[in-house]
A protein has these predicted regions:
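Short, flexible, glycine/charge-rich loop motifs used to bind or transfer phosphoryl groups or to couple energy/partner
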Residues: 32, 90-91, 148-150
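Glycine-/charge-enriched secondary-structure boundary and capping motifs
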Residues: 1-6, 11-15, 22, 27-28, ...
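Glycine-rich anion-binding loops of enzyme active sites
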Residues: 1-63, 187
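Polyanion-binding loop/helix "lid" in catalytic or ligand-binding cores
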Residues: 69-114
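Active-site phosphate/oxyanion-binding loops
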Residues: 60, 64-76, 138-143
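Phosphate-binding glycine-rich loops and adjacent basic patches that engage nucleotide phosphates
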Residues: 37-38, 42-50, 70-79, 130-137
Length: 212
């Protein structure tokens, strides 16, 4: 059938379930993709990379023999990845200190690019500051694999947001109040996206998730 298909909620699988939720937001209180400003700090909540590891284990691109809580690596990572973090209360208060945010579904780099394109800015990401799950150390994952999963893995459903440097203390205080881990991982700037590790350009060969 020659019908154009538009939208990001597409899959190669035989079954597709779409759920739509609608609501209202007070004027000026929306966290948008197009509000990042030069010199804003870049933050993420929680940790990154564990869902991506589950995918790699599922496809057998990575093999790990270590068990956690009596579970093989794939079962453990998959089950833990299905527990989606609830950041709603934190996000409701975050609007007082940030105008720009989205959730990380297709990978940090891919979703950050959505912000950069809509806001017409560039960014610097410091790889050594990315928050990694403790399982990476337990499984003794190679550092390059850890970095790749954090940058491109996807499925984290953590918040990626920007905010003026003057708001850092308030943001960290808010994070403490709601027991949410928040990490500052970079800076909004003019130009393009730069990914650095200890000040040196990080080699980029990978892509975030693409629906097709």
């Amino acid at each position: 059938v020659d019908i154009p298909l538009i939208g990001g909620n597409t899959t190669k699988g035989e079954l597709s379930i779409t759920i739509s939720a609608y609501g209202l937001v007070d004027k000026g209180k929306a966290l948008r993709r197009d509000k990042a400003k030069v010199n804003d700090d870049i933050y993420v909540t929680g940790t990154l990379g564990l869902p991506g590891l589950a995918v790699e284990l599922g496809y057998k691109n990575i093999c790990l023999d270590k068990f956690i809580d009596g579970k093989d690596a794939f079962s453990y990572c998959y089950e833990k990845s299905m527990i989606i973090p609830d950041r709603c209360e934190f996000a409701h208060k975050l609007v007082n200190y940030s105008d720009c945010a989205l959730d990380i579904s297709d990978g940090l780099v891919g979703d950050l690019r959505h912000i950069l394109e809509r806001s017409c800015v560039g960014a610097r990401i410091d790889v050594e500051k990315l928050p990694k799950p403790c399982e990476f150390s337990i499984y003794n994952l190679d550092e390059k694999i850890q970095d790749k999963l954090c940058l491109y893995g996807g499925g984290d459903y953590e918040l990626l947001f920007t905010a003026p440097s003057a708001n850092e203390d308030k943001i960290m205080e808010l994070a403490s109040t709601y027991a949410v881990k928040v990490s500052k991982i970079g800076k909004i700037k003019n130009g393009t996206l730069e990914i650095l590790k200890h000040g040196k350009m990080y080699h980029q060969n990978d892509k975030s998730f693409e629906h097709f």
